[in-house]
From Swiss-Prot:
First enzyme in the biosynthesis of tetrahydrobiopterin (BH4). Catalyzes the conversion of GTP into dihydroneopterin triphosphate (7,8-dihydroneopterin 3'-triphosphate), which is subsequently catalyzed by 6-pyruvoyltetrahydropterin synthase (ptsA) and sepiapterin reductase (sprA). Toroid-shaped homodecamer, composed of two pentamers of five dimers. Residues 1-24 are annotated as: Disordered. The lineage of its organism: Eukaryota, Amoebozoa, Evosea, Eumycetozoa, Dictyostelia. The gene is gchA. Its EC number is 3.5.4.16. One of its GO terms (biological process) is response to Gram-negative bacterium. InterPro entries: GTP-CH-I_C/QueF, GTP-CH-I_N, GTP_CycHdrlase_I, GTP_CycHdrlase_I_CS, GTP_CycHdrlase_I_dom. PROSITE patterns: GTP_CYCLOHYDROL_1_1, GTP_CYCLOHYDROL_1_2. It catalyses: GTP + H2O = 7,8-dihydroneopterin 3'-triphosphate + formate + H(+). This is GTP cyclohydrolase 1. One of its GO terms (molecular function) is GTP binding.
């Protein structure tokens, strides 16, 4: 198994505020936050008021009048939108998976592909969007199919970079299901490459994260890549 995808279950850290797993990557320790379900910040009036004030300051800094008709409700709308786009911080993988792990004595590959994902690049806070493909080989236990998409959604709804998002999805499935292997591929278009910078519409970024048998066995890995490309 590569340094980037060690087992995450060996060193479980108890923390009252959030579920955190510690893994060794060969260069020290990395904390992997699987989250804890919390009251949505969108219902926190203090947070909303602070964010609205900040948005008004941004609008004024752009030379706009935040009190003109078209912008009067923009601070509230933008604040609520940002909280929705980042609601993954308030969600827990444990809560999402719940009791949807089933003993099926199944050992063949399971693939859910073309999961739509939307996220915000943490560098410019502009969107990137695309498709996520998830595959795993169960060790008897299988996960409800919709839960794979929900796990991807938890990590996509945070400030992200695509490489980390791909890795976190794989880590969460590995840690909670303990399968024989996990593979995740994300294909995405980044607005920071379309609307600014190099301004190259049509460019896409592909990232992958594999562990277990997908890393050790090239034939298994090739089967996964073949399945996510079939009939396209």
């Amino acid at each position: 198994m590569s340094d980037n995808l060690k087992s995450y279950q060996d060193n479980h850290i108890e923390n009252e505020d959030e579920e955190i797993y510690e893994r060794s990557n060969g260069k020290g320790k990395e904390l992997v936050d699987f989250g804890k379900k919390r009251e949505p910040l969108i219902h926190n009036h203090e947070v909303l008021n602070t964010m609205q004030s900040s948005v008004k300051t941004l609008l004024s800094s752009l030379g706009e009048d935040p009190d003109r008709e078209g912008l009067l409700k923009t601070p509230l709308r933008m604040s609520k939108a940002l909280l929705f786009f980042t609601q993954g911080y308030e969600q827990s993988v444990d809560e999402v998976i719940g009791e949807a792990i089933f003993n099926e004595n199944h050992h063949e590959m399971v693939v859910v592909r073309d999961i739509d994902i939307f996220s915000l690049c943490e560098h410019h806070m502009v969107p990137f969007h695309g498709k996520c493909h998830i595959g795993y080989i169960p060790d008897q236990k299988v996960l409800g199919l919709s839960k794979l998409a929900r796990v991807a959604e938890i990590f996509a709804r945070r400030l992200q970079v695509q490489e980390r998002l791909t890795r976190q999805i794989a880590q969460a499935i590995q840690a909670h299901l303990n399968p024989m292997g996990v593979a995740v591929v994300i294909e995405a278009s980044h607005m920071c490459m379309v609307m600014r910078g190099v301004q190259k519409p049509g460019a896409s970024t592909v990232t992958s994260s594999v562990c277990g048998i997908f890393e050790k066995d090239s034939r298994t890995r090739a089967e996964f890549f073949s399945l996510i490309k079939s009939n396209k």
